[in-house]
Amino acid sequence: EDRYQSDPGKCFAHIRKRVNEHPDSDLIYALSELSYVEGKKAEKEGRLGDALNHYGISLTNSYDYLFSDDLEDTRNAYDPQFRAVCDLYNESLEDTLRLLCTDNKIEPGKTYRIETPDREFVVRAEMRGQWGPDEFDHYEFVSDYEIETLRNRHTTFGLGVPLIAVRKAPADADEREKYYAEGLS
């Protein structure tokens, strides 16, 4: 803790060196968590490049914690730390996507690149289902909304960032369009 408080950069370098020498789930978790905290600090201070880098480090190390073959024997899905890493992965991914997307809008069919000192990720916003990417204007983050009047709340836990697809107004005036709400999602 003292090393982190006095020089976070040296602390990260030390932890990363130890992780590279011997992948350890606790060290990977610590690196992911500290990187996420530093990303939040950098974003708040307007250092968006640094924030993106820290979120990327948190994202990649969280991913390694969850899926690396090196940790297969020690990983325990029932350990509360495992759930915390799942949350850290999701939060890092969402914050990374927010920084990559203008006005917090992810465009269908667009590819986003995330580069960290460790690796590069390519994230593609893909459509699944019968509607094509040209039928949507943008995606929005579900976490930007709060349900206030529905009594039933259905939550599915897992990895990823839930999005809302906002439909474009069609160019041709189909008679059925009058029955659709504006910005139908």
Region roles according to the model:
Residues 1-27, 31-185:
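Flexible, membrane-associating and regulatory peripheral segments of lipid-active enzymes
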